[in-house]
């Protein structure tokens, strides 16, 4: 028995592959089982095309066994097997894939099979955890069996052996444990179950293992039953993925159970989205919109992405490239036989197929959300409560490139409707002479509703959108307009010519009072002017056009040391008794007028939700008036 050397610069290539190509040692089992699945698929295909092969898909299986004393894991299949030439070509030449050649030979006729292998290197991943691998195989239709054995880069041997049935068994002898690596865990039943469930759950053939269980039997010595151990062959994998089944054949509770188990959620999903695409790229997808917001969703720790499978084999647990950032809340799986994988089958090559799938999924998710908004408003508002903020972030991100896609999905509170409305609903209810979309920002709907700056618009029956999240004003700035109607803050002041003319008259009539207040407050305010919007309140603060008070609060929250501040424009209601008292004091008692001016400014700060410049000074002023 002569030892043969691997071909193709074997020592360097095998060492490179073992230490560089794969990043997770545990995937060795995925690769060996995928090879076994390919072997079964090849014989299954032969049975479909050759009447002399009396086998059906139900006849095939993959068995997994462990010998802890010998430190071996054995994977056995009853697939097509190999002869001596196959062993030389497939295992003696690194990076020679028999499965790939098979797919090339039969072409489109493999549509009913799930042949996985492409590169011919997966088998050698076993050497990441093993110091010796033995392959015993007999090709279907042959009377001779062969044994291939290797300890790695030193070469391999091929000899005849005894094997009664067609198929292949791969016997992997695990390395000894080290301080850094605990290879013995791969001999444990729980670990093997975990790996099968994680990587090979949807292999289309049963993966079986002899499992020791216990059952209760009546005891002749005690009233309590005895627990007697017994061994049972248990199928570890699901075989048929739920996303491969027809939607009509799957009950809603099955989808819910799959979601909860797969994504470790206690709540059912709010929405289930199924996709089956054929064409340039063939794939199936099963997507879920969660029923609740994940606790870490709005944190940096949250990882977006869909589980990615290739022909039922897990390739990536979370593939971020399949979801745009604005739909990062979606969970689910994508399975495609058309993906261009890299040599380790761990990472996806960034290619056209992936982009096509991602683009298609984005359109599908948008379509489902739009349908929910139209037909199930209450359900959509529940979704909006959970993930609406993410859609807003999507509008403002990447310089607004996604705004046209997302703008019709947005909801804001309406001052007149007293409920959430879309931008389209707002525009459809606008007065004929209204040229802009008004909005007002604040911490809560109640606080915004009480803002004195809104009194005039409310009296006119103008609808105002209430912005209660820090991102809302950035959304308005990014959109700029909707259906040719520009966004305008309700805090911006008079917009019609008559109101502007009246403001000019008031400013001229009371110019001494405004000048006095400005001089008293100094740089605390940029301007003091008459208000055209106040009705029952004496004073309010408005901001300049570049930055609002809510944006100032946001920047202060993000950067506490930030010096960015909105302009402070003090508006006074010339028809309010407080203004009359101020005007009289300017002439009769300038010192008291200064107190009035400071009090009015502090009141305006409080109404705007801004911190007082001098809280102690404010209380002193109030107490002074009470003497």
Name these PLM-found stretches.
Residues 115, 136-155, 175-627:
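GHKL/Bergerat-fold ATPase module in large chromosome/replication-associated machines
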């Amino acid at each position: 028995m002569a030892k043969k050397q691997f071909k193709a610069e074997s020592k360097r290539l095998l060492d490179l592959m073992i230490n560089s190509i794969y990043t997770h040692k545990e995937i060795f089992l995925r690769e060996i089982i995928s090879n076994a699945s390919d072997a079964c698929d090849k014989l299954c295909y032969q049975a479909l095309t050759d009447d002399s092969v009396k086998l059906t898909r139900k006849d095939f299986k993959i068995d997994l066994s462990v010998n802890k004393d010998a430190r071996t894991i054995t994977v056995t299949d009853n697939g097509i097997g190999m002869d001596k030439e196959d062993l030389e070509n497939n295992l003696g030449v690194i990076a020679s894939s028999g499965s790939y050649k098979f797919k090339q030979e039969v072409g489109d006729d493999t549509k009913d099979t799930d042949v996985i292998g492409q590169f011919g290197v997966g088998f050698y991943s076993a050497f990441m955890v093993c110091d010796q691998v033995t392959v015993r195989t007999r090709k279907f239709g042959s009377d001779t069996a062969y044994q291939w054995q290797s300890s790695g880069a030193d070469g391999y041997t091929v000899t005849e052996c005894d094997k009664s049935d067609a198929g292949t068994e791969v016997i992997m002898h695990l390395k000894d444990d080290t301080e850094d690596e605990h290879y013995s865990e791969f001999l444990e039943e729980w670990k093997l179950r975990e790996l099968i469930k994680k990587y090979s759950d949807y292999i289309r053939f049963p993966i079986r293992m002899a499992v020791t269980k216990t059952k209760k039997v009546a005891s002749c010595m005690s009233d309590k039953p005895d627990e007697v151990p017994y061994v049972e062959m248990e199928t570890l994998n699901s075989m048929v993925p739920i996303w491969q089944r027809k939607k009509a054949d799957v009950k809603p509770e099955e989808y819910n159970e799959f979601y909860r188990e797969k994504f470790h959620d206690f709540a059912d999903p709010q929405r289930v989205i199924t996709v089956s695409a054929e064409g340039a790229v063939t794939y199936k997808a099963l997507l879920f919109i969660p029923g609740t917001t994940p606790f870490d969703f709005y944190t940096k720790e949250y990882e977006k992405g869909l589980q990615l499978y290739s022909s039922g084999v897990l390739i990536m647990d979370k593939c971020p490239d399949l979801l745009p950032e604005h739909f990062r809340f979606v969970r689910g799986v994508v399975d495609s036989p058309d993906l261009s994988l890299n040599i380790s089958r761990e990472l996806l090559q960034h290619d056209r197929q992936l982009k096509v799938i991602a683009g298609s999924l984005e359109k599908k998710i948008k379509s489902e959300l739009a349908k929910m908004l139209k037909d199930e408003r209450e359900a959509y508002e529940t979704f909006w409560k959970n993930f609406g903020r993410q859609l807003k972030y999507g509008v403002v991100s990447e310089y607004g490139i996604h705004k046209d896609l997302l703008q019709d999905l947005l909801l804001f509170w309406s001052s007149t409707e007293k409920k959430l409305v879309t931008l389209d609903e707002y525009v459809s209810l606008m007065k004929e002479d209204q040229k802009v979309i008004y909005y007002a920002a604040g911490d809560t709907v109640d606080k915004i509703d009480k803002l004195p700056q809104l009194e005039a618009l409310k009296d006119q029956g103008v609808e105002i959108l209430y912005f209660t999240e820090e991102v809302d004003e950035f959304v308005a700035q990014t959109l700029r307009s909707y259906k040719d109607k520009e966004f305008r803050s309700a805090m911006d002041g008079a917009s019609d010519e008559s109101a502007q003319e009246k403001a000019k008259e008031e400013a001229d009539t009371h110019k001494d009072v405004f000048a006095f207040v400005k001089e008293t407050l100094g740089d605390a305010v940029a301007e003091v002017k008459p208000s055209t919007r106040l009705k029952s309140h004496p004073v309010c603060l408005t901001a300049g056009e570049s930055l609002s008070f809510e944006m100032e609060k946001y920047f202060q929250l993000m950067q506490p040391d930030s010096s960015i501040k909105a302009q402070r424009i003090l508006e006074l209601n010339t028809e309010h008794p407080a203004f009359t008292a101020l005007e009289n004091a300017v002439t009769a008692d300038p010192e008291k007028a200064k107190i009035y001016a400071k009090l009015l400014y502090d009141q305006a700060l409080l109404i705007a939700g801004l911190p007082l410049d001098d809280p102690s000074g404010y209380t002193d002023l109030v107490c002074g008036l009470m003497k």
